[in-house]
Structure formats: structure tokens, C-alpha cells
Amino acid sequence: MTVKQSQASRLSPIFEPCRDDDRAALIGYLPTGYPDVPTSVQAMVALVESGCDIVEVGVPYSDPGMDGPTIARATEAALHGGVRVRDTLAAVEAISAAGGRAVVMTYWNPVLRYGVDAFARDLAAAGGYGLITPDLIPDEAGQWLAASERHGLDRIFLVAPSSTPQRLALTVEASRGFVYAASTMGVTGARDAVSHAAPELVSRVREISDIPVGVGLGVRSREQAAQIGGYADGVIVGSALVSALGDGGLTALRALTEELAAGVRQRAAAS
């Protein structure tokens, strides 16, 4: 079967030039409010300036079931600092003002509390491109599907190596912008080796759709970025960027982002 996308994606103008350049897009994640709100916003702007094609802006949540220890510690610190959802929307505005493209990554509960349509409206008004919802499945996403149509936002759902063919097709059909491929089973975090399950998962998506596929959960080096960029449309980096910011501040964050941006281009140079 082939899954067709129902509407044009906001993110297509980002992925298409990357495909033309024979490279993957670099997608960088940071949580709002770590180590504090102003620094987190500066850090996200630094991602844009250092070569990130898309910035994932995290909404800290008190029960982050899929986050590894690095991100969990950072989000806990942000929550202790009093971060609010409106701070995430302000970060999206700052990224947009810097010429970047932002998507928000959030567990579903904060969106429900804010109001699904109100969140979509305010995210679009801030210049956001879409929403990644790691704990929301399309079957339970009726309100979000409707709100994303009303406000012109992309919706990024997750697929995993364990996804059945039926679940994969349903998820891909509901997604717009890109599909987030979790390259390992379990929680996120930087790893020395990249999962061998990821290329197979990307292939399974491509058998049924031409929607871009972003691979996350583990990248922390130029070499790994180049490796994943060899088969994925997007290389997603989270824990390694959070660690760089926490350990070395904006200088270390910029250096790692530039290294990763070189990594996704390395494959293009070699091909």
C-alpha cells in the first residue's frame, strides 16, 4: 500500500532543498527553561546560527516517560525554575525572529491543560511549524488532527521498530511534515553506537510513503550524524546538545552543533 499526504506540509520547504543537496536536515532538541529560561532561548537561537535546520523546543513535563536521564534531569531543573508553556511559545517566537524553524516537542498532558485549539492557535501565531507528540497515537488524536488543520501546523508522530505494518501505515498517514523514527527501543539518550534497527525502520516507512523520516535517540558525534544522514531525511539530536549546554554553556553548544551540521553535509561531500 502507499500512503498519500492529504495537505501540503509546512516543513517541506526545509526538507526538499536538503534532498536536492543530497543531505539530511539537522534537527536539534533543547528543553525550554534549562538552565534557565533566558539562557535556553539564547541556546535555541545559537542552534539556528550554528547550522540547525529545525529546532525542537521541548515543553518540560513532570512525568517524562520516554526521556533518558540527561533530558529528564534538565527538564526537572527547568520545572524547579518555574518554566511555563508560555515560555516555550516565547522561545518559538525568538527562533522565528532569528530566521529559524521551530517545532514543539511535548507530552500530551500540557497541551490538554492549555487547551488543544488554543495551543495550536498560539503556536502558529508564534511562528511554529508543528508539534511532535511522543505519547499521543493517531487513534486518540482527533482534537489535535482537527486543530492542526485549522491552524496549518504539521503533526509529527512516532514510529518504532516494534510498530506493526498496520500501526506504521496509520501513523504515517496521520503525520505531516515528517515521521519521527525512534531508532532504539526505550528511552532517549546519547549512545556510542547507533541502532541497527533504524535503517530498516526508515525503509519500512519509505515503502509506503515519501514523507521525510527523522531518526533520533542516540546521536552525539559528527560521525554518527553522517552515518544516519546516509539513509534518513533528518538527523535528530537531543541529549548530546543538552549535555553540551549543561557542561560547557553556549560555547560548547555552538561547537557541537557546528560539528553535527558538518556531519550531515559530510555524506553529501562523499557521495
UniProtKB/Swiss-Prot annotation:
Q: Which residues form the active site?
A: E56, D67
Q: Cite the GO molecular-function annotations of the record.
A: tryptophan synthase activity
Task: Kindly list any coiled-coil regions of this protein.
Answer: none
Source superkingdom: Bacteria
State a single Pfam family of this protein. Answer: Trp_syntA
Q: What is its EC number?
A: 4.2.1.20
Question: Might you report a single GO cellular component term?
Answer: cytosol
| Keyword annotations from UniProtKB, A to Z | Amino-acid biosynthesis, Aromatic amino acid biosynthesis, Lyase, Tryptophan biosynthesis
Does Lyase appear among the keywords? yes
Catalyzed chemical reaction(s): (1S,2R)-1-C-(indol-3-yl)glycerol 3-phosphate + L-serine = D-glyceraldehyde 3-phosphate + L-tryptophan + H2O
Which pathway does the database say it acts in? Amino-acid biosynthesis; L-tryptophan biosynthesis; L-tryptophan from chorismate: step 5/5
Say what the protein does. The alpha subunit is responsible for the aldol cleavage of indoleglycerol phosphate to indole and glyceraldehyde 3-phosphate.
Q: Which HAMAP family match?
A: Trp_synth_alpha
Q: Which family does it belong to?
A: Belongs to the TrpA family.
Provide the assembly information: Tetramer of two alpha and two beta chains.
Q: Which PANTHER family match?
A: TRYPTOPHAN SYNTHASE ALPHA CHAIN, CHLOROPLASTIC (PTHR43406:SF1), TRYPTOPHAN SYNTHASE, ALPHA CHAIN (PTHR43406)
Q: What is this protein called?
A: Tryptophan synthase alpha chain
Its gene name is trpA
